Amino acid sequence: MDTLLKTPNKLEFLHPVHGFSVKASSFNSVKPHKFGSRKICENWGKGVCVKAKSSALLELVPETKKENLDFELPMYDPSKGLVVDLAVVGGGPAGLAVAQQVSEAGLSVVSIDPSPKLIWPNNYGVWVDEFEAMDLLDCLDATWSGTVVYIDDNTTKDLDRPYGRVNRKQLKSKMMQKCILNGVKFHHAKVIKVIHEEAKSMLICNDGVTIQATVVLDATGFSRCLVQYDKPYKPGYQVAYGILAEVEEHPFDTSKMVLMDWRDSHLGNNMELKERNRKVPTFLYAMPFSSNKIFLEETSLVARPGLRMDDIQERMVARLNHLGIKVKSIEEDEHCVIPMGGSLPVIPQRVVGTGGTAGLVHPSTGYMVARTLAAAPVVANAIIHYLGSEKDLLGNELSAAVWKDLWPIERRRQREFFCFGMDILLKLDLPATRRFFDAFFDLEPRYWHGFLSSRLYLPELIFFGLSLFSRASNTSRIEIMTKGTLPLVNMINNLLQDTE
């Protein structure tokens, strides 16, 4: 799944280096929390197999390593004092995608990031058809012909929809090379302040450099470096712990990606942990690359407050023990927290947002990378159009027009429905969650495909909801009616208040 934000084990949002939705992995210096009281030997030898147990598994996490792209970047020259058309704050997929497309139109663009050549540490999983539509199939380093969902020990859903893992080095290289070819300049710094004038904005960087731009794009992820909010931000949280590991063996079919494994038989001997999992369930997400290399991630789909990281790690250890997965080595690990739902930023406002900054994460699933990349042409084309239009839009008027194109009313209504879905999921325990997904993946593919990929709009979403309700068990229908009534009322009220 998309992994976007680094946290320690308590859900404390760190003040991040802008431009990176910070995520703990082997690419940073945050040490994983060691849980369990068993003392661990210091000298695990190379090739030693470790049956997942207490903190022994985490002792295999490698030391920090950072990998940079191996090519030179054209740097921004502050001595010229030029006003660029677009300043992009943040060098993640969201920011680079817009920078690439705006610069293709011949506009001047500067990308500001403290580590512009650093390869993203995030693990991104996407539906293959989403990347195919954007001509990005060459940026997938592994694909599976389908996915599987384990509802419980007796019910399995085989989904005929190919899935892939993003090659983050290839994706960033491809985007950066196009930016360079188009004349994008890069500045190695962090933006600490923005000052707006009538027709331009001045970005003050931590190295003392001031960059002037007609349009400012905040692509800093959930740090929300420049974009402003005027409502309480109360999202749900998707929390996960994952490892890319070499194992002796694993029980999964290497031709299928495990989208969700809701089984809890691994908790049979630990009633306290089983009860916690019943109340706030977690599932396994797994990418089997071969018979002995696999990405494993224990995930809480959405909770408020989010689960503690050590709780999730404990559940993962119990699951791996039960599955007989013996870890030989860990190539990288990740702690991720994805805020889901919550209020949108102030719309419109002078700084334009994209990606996590602009609320593009799917409130019901946590998916974002494909949605963000698909939204890049919308943002880029709006900037290109309004900068070059005869209307002579500048400053607040120009930004307002771009925001309107990014969040038209049909997209806002769609997001409201997705938040309604999240509010229901927040209330479901493990049995109810199983019943929900048993019905969800029995829907016609066009419905569940469209829901997961943000392709359904409100009229279609209403039919989606009715279809889901009709396929649900009687127990699940009662749960949806009792637990979904208040979220439904809130959604309808928000829809009525939100007008053009």
Curated annotation (Swiss-Prot):
UniProt-annotated binding residues for NAD(+): 86-114
Its EC number(s): 5.5.1.19
Signal peptide: none
Keyword NAD: yes
One protein family per Pfam: Lycopene_cycl
Main location: plastid
GO BP terms: carotene biosynthetic process; ubiquinone biosynthetic process; xanthophyll biosynthetic process
Catalytic activity annotation: a carotenoid psi-end group = a carotenoid beta-end derivative
Keyword vocabulary terms for this entry: Carotenoid biosynthesis, Chloroplast, Isomerase, NAD, Plastid, Transit peptide
Transit peptide feature, positions: 1-81
GO molecular function, one term: oxidoreductase activity
InterPro entries per record: FAD/NAD-bd_sf (IPR036188), Lycopene_cyclase_b/e (IPR010108)
GO CC annotation, single: mitochondrion
Pathway: Carotenoid biosynthesis; beta-carotene biosynthesis; Carotenoid biosynthesis; beta-zeacarotene biosynthesis
Subcellular location: Plastid, Chloroplast
Family affiliation: Belongs to the lycopene cyclase family.
Role, per record: Catalyzes the double cyclization reaction which converts lycopene to beta-carotene and neurosporene to beta-zeacarotene.
The protein's name: Lycopene beta cyclase, chloroplastic
Source species of the chain: Nicotiana tabacum
